[in-house]
């Protein structure tokens, strides 16, 4: 509907033809109203040529043409597949993961290993693997037992630098700038001893000293035993008298009967008795003289 005066029909036909020509023009072309400066309007063929030049003018690295065509075929699989057959195995850059690639038709569900939510408890041992399973189980039990024992016997222990003095002490530039006048002082490690270490060390020293003293006493006793004299004269006399009593057949202190030959025996000199008396007197000098065999008391 239109209000107001309208153009005649013959003029409307010319306007319709101009609109059809404008529709045939390229979309996006600038519409010009009014007079135009000569040379400003660009021909259609030159404009298309300029657009092609803009499309081909690329700055920096560009994707090869065959790769670009292949990517276009992936995005539009319904297009020509001849180029895909020409370059079936060529790929540039990182490949698309398989789960992002378009799939055609039904697909097999993926496997997630042997795990299943329906399995409850350990799986039964395969036939023929009973011995291997028993060995593995025994080995695991031994390892578990050793780990438990180590955990029970574990005792916390401080590191060495926390319990001992450094072997080499330095003043770190804070000492006197003179030569040392005395000997180098030794490191005092007595304060590092544990409560029972000092007592144990003293006992070991005492036991070693006692062993040395006992050995020295044994050597002195052997020397004294070699140098000491034998039994005294009284002991020798008593021993001989006891032997005579045993030979007579009577015990010591026992009363023996009267014997005429022994009791009435004349104590005078017998023939040849003088020589025997002289020999017996010679023995007196040996008894009261110094001993020849035993020179030490």
From Swiss-Prot:
Pfam families: DUF3752. Residues 77-87 have a biased composition (Acidic residues). Residues 41-52, 147-161, 236-268 have a biased composition (Basic and acidic residues). It comes from the Eukaryota. Signal peptide: none annotated. InterPro entries: DUF3752 (IPR022226), GPAM1-like (IPR046331). Residues 19-133, 147-214, 226-277 are annotated as: Disordered. Residues 88-101 have a biased composition (Polar residues). It comes from Caenorhabditis elegans. This is Uncharacterized protein F26A3.7. PANTHER family: GPALPP MOTIFS-CONTAINING PROTEIN 1.
């Amino acid at each position: 509907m239109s209000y107001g005066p309208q153009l005649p029909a013959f003029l409307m036909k010319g306007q319709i033809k101009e609109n059809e020509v404008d529709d045939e023009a390229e979309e996006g072309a600038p519409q010009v109203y009014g007079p135009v400066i000569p040379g400003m309007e660009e021909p259609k063929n030159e404009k298309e040529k300029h657009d092609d030049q803009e499309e081909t003018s690329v700055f920096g690295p560009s994707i090869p043409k065959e790769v670009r065509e292949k990517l276009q075929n992936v995005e539009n699989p319904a297009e020509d597949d001849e180029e895909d057959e020409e370059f079936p195995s060529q790929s540039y850059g990182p490949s698309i993961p398989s789960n992002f690639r378009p799939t055609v038709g039904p697909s097999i569900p993926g496997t997630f290993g042997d795990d299943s939510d329906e399995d409850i408890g350990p799986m039964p041992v395969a036939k023929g693997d009973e011995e291997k399973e028993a060995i593995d189980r025994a080995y695991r039990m031994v390892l578990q037992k050793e780990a438990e024992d180590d955990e029970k016997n574990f005792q916390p222990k401080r590191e060495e630098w926390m319990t001992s003095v450094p072997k080499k002490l330095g003043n770190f530039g804070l000492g006197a700038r003179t030569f040392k006048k005395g000997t180098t002082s030794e490191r005092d490690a007595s304060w590092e001893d544990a409560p029972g270490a000092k007592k144990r060390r003293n006992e070991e020293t005492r036991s070693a000293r006692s062993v040395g003293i006992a050995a020295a006493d044994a050597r002195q006793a052997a020397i004294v035993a070699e140098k000491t004299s034998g039994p005294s004269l009284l002991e020798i006399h008593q021993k001989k008298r006891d032997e005579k009593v045993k030979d007579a057949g009577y015990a010591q202190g026992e009363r023996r009967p009267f014997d005429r030959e022994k009791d009435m025996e004349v104590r005078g000199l017998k023939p040849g008795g003088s020589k025997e008396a002289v020999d017996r007197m010679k023995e007196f000098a040996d008894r009261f003289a110094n001993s020849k065999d035993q020179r030490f008391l």
